[in-house]
């Protein structure tokens, strides 16, 4: 038997646990103050309108709903992006962010059969799985500094500088998973310059746009690469979190070409790759996202709802740090400096095991916790348990 997915396996154990007051800090889902997955008002308005219209659900084109692809381009690259004006971006709706990664990986494997893929150490577990399954050799570049609970930026630059030209570099645009440690704009500028100098191929994964500072600020890495003069790069993005549409599997793959003609050729290759995989994406989730982003009024409402989610996560980080400090554990202050849904808590596997066994609190063995799963009702429970295993 193949080894099970650690996150899915942990979720199964959590569901089977009958203890009251259990808390799941392992799975990557945003929950509201009631511990529920929210249904956003902007999404609900589009869904209700769709239900009233009663449109049939035919197959979408291979690259998805045109309105969805166009709205994605504006959100990811910026509405005034020169790349969009020049027609240099080929975008396809995909089955979630994972689907975007796999379609992109399959396409690049055919185009660059001798290239390697470099991912951050650590990275989201599925990054290595996806690119390995596509046939790539995957290598690591330095990223997280366990001693400072921050970014090992000198190590990152050193490792990127050693990569062979043509290497595909997987970069997290914002809200790094699993660490929550991000680059500053100034650091991104240095990375962009180095990637360009070394002739590396950037593959940017943006699954959490809007969960740190806002939709535009969180796309800074994409915008910097777009302005850099680099001929080609790849972006995979997901709406699972930002639209709270986890089960709808709404993602997109965008590939920048050197010219309009190259982008058109790339789009043809992407469609061929999709056709041999799942033929076309699902209708419902894409229509919801396109409906929200295509309405000025609903776009404003969605941005405000996204801001509420973002601010609640910030508040949970601050509350956790404050309550731990009150128990003499000021060393956890770094949690407040991290961004997005996740935190590399610094807890050891032994401490994580104790949280599960003694307190019915579930987390990943690496110490990653989902801050978005905290709320006012369970925060004290979690803090007291973390304090107990930390002393």
Where are these predicted regions, by residue range?
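Structural signature of PLP-dependent enzymes
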Residues: 267-286, 292-321
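Hydrophobic beta-strand scaffold residues
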Residues: 25, 138, 202, 362-363
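Conserved PLP-binding catalytic core of the aspartate aminotransferase-like
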Residues: 302-358
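Conserved core of the PLP fold type I
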Residues: 44, 49, 54-197, 210-211, ...
